[in-house]
A protein has these predicted regions:
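N-terminal catalytic or cofactor-binding beta/alpha core of small enzyme domains
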Residues: 2-137, 144-156, 160-172
Length: 173
C-alpha cells in the first residue's frame, strides 16, 4: 500500500507526463480538508478519458518543481485558506498570473506551492501549461475526512478538471 503523502507517481496513463497531462494532487491525508487536493486529483484521474499521470505531493516546493520538470501540461490541485467560504473554488493559469502566497500561509513547508511557482517562473522553469485549482478548506486540524462543503467542492473540481483536460488534449492534437 502506498503512503498517501508519497511524491512518487501514480499513473492512470502510460509513459512520461510530457505525452499527456500531469495531475498533481497536493495535501496531507491526515489533516482533514488539506486532503482535498489528493482526493480531487485521484478522482479526476479515475474519471479522465485522456492520457493522464497522477502524482501526489505533500506540497514541498522543490519536489513540485521536480515533478513538473518534464511535463508539457500540468493541473495542480490543492486546498487553501484565504478567508472565503469553505468549498470556494479558484482556477489560475500560473503562466499568466501569480498564485497568492497568502493562500499557503498555514503550510507546514518553508517553501510553498506559491513560492515554487514564483521561483520556477523566475528561472524560466514553468511547464508550458500550468493550471492551479484551489479549494477553500475549513478544517485543517488532525483527522481524516473532508468537511461537507469541501467534499461537495471536490465533485465540482473533478468536473472542471475534466473540462481542462479536454481543452488541453484538444489543443495538443
Amino acid at each position: 500500500m502506498r503512503h498517501p503523502l508519497s511524491d512518487a507517481p501514480r499513473g492512470a496513463g502510460v509513459g512520461p507526463a510530457a505525452q499527456g497531462v500531469l495531475v498533481i494532487g497536493v495535501g496531507n491525508a491526515y489533516r482533514r480538508d488539506d486532503a482535498a487536493g489528493l482526493v480531487a486529483a485521484r478522482r479526476l484521474c479515475e474519471a479522465a478519458r485522456a492520457d493522464v499521470l497522477l502524482r501526489e505531493a505533500s506540497g514541498e516546493g522543490t519536489a513540485l518543481m521536480a515533478a513538473w520538470e518534464e511535463a508539457e501540461a500540468v493541473i495542480l490541485i490543492d486546498a487553501v485558506r484565504s478567508g472565503a467560504p469553505a468549498g470556494t473554488i479558484y482556477r489560475l493559469d500560473a503562466r499568466a498570473e501569480a498564485v497568492p502566497q497568502a493562500w499557503f500561509r498555514y503550510s507546514t513547508h518553508a517553501f510553498s506551492v506559491a513560492e515554487a511557482i514564483a521561483l520556477a517562473r523566475a528561472l524560466n522553469r514553468l511547464p508550458p501549461r500550468l493550471i492551479v485549482f484551489a479549494v477553500e478548506g475549513e478544517r485543517f486540524g488532525a483527522g481524516v475526512g473532508l468537511s461537507p462543503g469541501v467534499e461537495r467542492a471536490v465533485d465540482e473540481l473533478v468536473r472542471r478538471g475534466l473540462q481542462e483536460i479536454d481543452r488541453i488534449t484538444r489543443n495538443s492534437r
